[in-house]
């Protein structure tokens, strides 16, 4: 139910914009608007620790639904096979389609039962005496949210804040709420926006962009370095030269316009020329090595002849 001041304000705003926003008079919109305000009031009271604990609580509910559902399916689907094998040592004769349909039905019932059981367990952990259950009220506007300040989070016990939020959300979509509370625990700015502000923006004709959590490019935080502007490859150095057609490139002798086969032939020709050059270089080295050896032998033979002439001259002089 709306407070008196909020009812008057809501009525005045609605009357002023009846022609522009006719859907605001419908019951489904009023109900959704009330639920959004109630959620926003309770969400503003949560601190980082509350969000982390609520994320763990709803994650445990999601796990309970998963394991409970598959255990129920396995129990109904596999029991006839086990019984048949125990009696006849074979699994022939079991009606598989019937077992599968019954297993799917058991999957849904077991999922709901396991999730509800874990949800009740999480509530009892936050309200072991049952006092919060007796004093719980799901009517928004009771705590004068317009005068809300952050210091009021200390006045409400932690278990009561978490209990009120879980009673409001119930046990539906536990995976989504677990992700929401964990992401807002890491970054509080990604909380759902104030529905009153969004309603005023819609009335003024502004564009409704949705919440920073549900309507964005990266809701789960997969991308890093948010806010950094990526360089635009188009804004780089621009080539002012005119664009030439293929025939103009051929006339100008542009090699870049050659076909792929011509590029392959050119590369193979270059490789063959390089291999021939390397072979010539090796042969030059080989020949130069032999020439050096020949010069060395020639020099050694001339030295021997010179020594022999000297010795013969000495001996001839002595004899004379």
Curated annotation (Swiss-Prot):
Q: Where is the signal peptide?
A: none
Source organism, top-level taxon: Eukaryota
Q: From the Swiss-Prot or TrEMBL record, give the protein name.
A: PUP1 protein homolog
Q: Does the keyword Membrane apply?
A: yes
Q: Which GO terms describe its cellular component?
A: mitochondrial membrane; mitochondrion
Q: Which organism is it from?
A: Saccharomyces cerevisiae (strain ATCC 204508 / S288c) (Baker's yeast)
Which InterPro entries does this one have?
A: Pup1-like
Membrane topology of the entry: Multi-pass membrane protein
Bias (Polar residues): 253-266
**What is the predominant subcellular site recorded for this chain?**
mitochondrion
Task: Give the UniProt family note.
Answer: Belongs to the PUP1 family.
Cysteine disulfide links? none
Location of this chain's protein in the cell? Mitochondrion membrane
Keyword list (alphabetical) reads: Membrane, Mitochondrion, Phosphoprotein, Transmembrane, Transmembrane helix
Region annotation (Disordered) maps to 205-320
**Misc. remarks from the entry:** Present with 922 molecules/cell in log phase SD medium.
Q: Which sequence positions carry the modification called Phosphoserine?
A: 230
> Where are the compositionally biased (Basic and acidic residues) regions?
267-284
Transmembrane spans: 66-85, 100-119
